[in-house]
Amino acid sequence: MKHILFISPTTSMDNGAEKSVYYLMKYLIQLGHTVINVTHAIGGEPQDKHEQLYKMIGVKNYYLPTIKWWWPDAPGGEILNREEATSYYRQNVQVIAEIIDKNEIDLVISNTVNVFQGAIAASCQKVPHFWLIHEFPKNEFAYYADKIDFIEEYSSELFSVTGELNNFLTPLFNKKVHPFISYTDQETKDLKKGNQVRIISVGRLTEGKNQLELIKAYKALNRLDIELVFIGGWDSKYKAICDEYIHENKLQKNVKFLGNLDNPWEEVTDRDICVFPSSMETFGLVYVEAILRGLPVILSDNLGHLTAFEIFSAGQIYKLGDIEELVTKLEQVIESFRDFSDRAQLDVERLRSLYTPEVAYKEILNGINHLENTGHQNTNLSHIKELLTLNMHPTRLERYARLISNMATKIRHKLRL
């Protein structure tokens, strides 16, 4: 049995990449492996909840302080002080290397292309490293297209979500990119009873998730007797755009935002229609969660949704951007809701037989079971480890100057806003 260290991209469970690998960790522990996870510190109640969630499945978490956890040019905030951010990057590589030694780690796995510290630490310690890719190098993740050589160089094995993403990435790498299916636990608990039909969309409110398209379709549907409910946190700027449209069209009483919930499916009833209008997905894990609960689903035809749809053949597909077609699909499901609901519930047993961790993670599990054949990354950084991990200790005067510089940078940033 192996000691496996994961590097996680976020300290939350509001995205498919985290959910999928959480259940991979859970399954690996069931098989007898030891699993440890490293992510960035966010403090407070959210971190406490996160830690408790992982303790429930037997995973020890390390929470590392940082200015920015992802690559400097990745989405997720601007770095105001590059020197300080670089110091944290270097410090965290050192801490991860120490965790590898202390826990006798056999394998490091980086979840998403957005985190790179584990790849460097693994190379410094001469430990195999797997990289799991969930993102197309397009739109908000286009930044990593010029990092493909690094990703390949510092990976013993590469894996990506199956289907369109894997097809897209395969010609970009010299190494084989092994496929895997994003997995989530199969909920066997019955949905609570609802009083009336509602339209539900689960997931973070973002431009990529494209909820404004659903709001526009809802206005065109002109069924104010049916609520539109969004479950999930939000990006403030995109939420403001949605709010503006809702107010302009006097939909405030009919459109609800419930925010981030620990278990969003506890809010969903057996009278709900799930709609997922995302413009870009790598798989569509929330779609799978919905159909496994026997809910009628309408989803856009983005590449990730199509990958999942090809596996499960459940739900209704509409052409992304075609609001008129989305309205037609909504009208059809509302008009014949009982028929659509009955068919969805009868299909659950078939869907569950297609969706098991053994099948979803077959290639990753095979790589772990034959780790002795994978070797290390192409590049060995152990000879220059100290250059990459040791920070100079500043004098008191230098610390004071850095503090003044940070304050000035923050003031300039606020003045630009």
Feature map (PLM): residue ranges:
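Donor nucleotide-sugar binding/catalytic pocket of nucleotide-sugar-dependent glycosyltransferases
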Residues: 62, 138, 153-188
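Aromatic "clamp/platform" in nucleotide-sugar-dependent glycosyltransferases that forms part
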Residues: 260, 279
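A charged, aromatic-enriched C-terminal amphipathic alpha-helix characteristic of glycosyltransferases
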Residues: 189, 338-395
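A conserved mid-protein helix/loop that constitutes part of the nucleotide-sugar donor-binding site
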Residues: 15-23, 197, 206-220, 240
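Short glycine/serine-rich donor-binding loops of glycosyltransferases
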Residues: 265, 284-287, 305-306
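Conserved acidic donor-binding segment of nucleotide-sugar-dependent glycosyltransferases
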Residues: 312-324, 331-338
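Short hydrophobic beta-strand element within catalytic cores of glycosyltransferases
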Residues: 296-300
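Glycosyltransferase donor-sugar binding loop
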Residues: 38-46, 202, 227-241
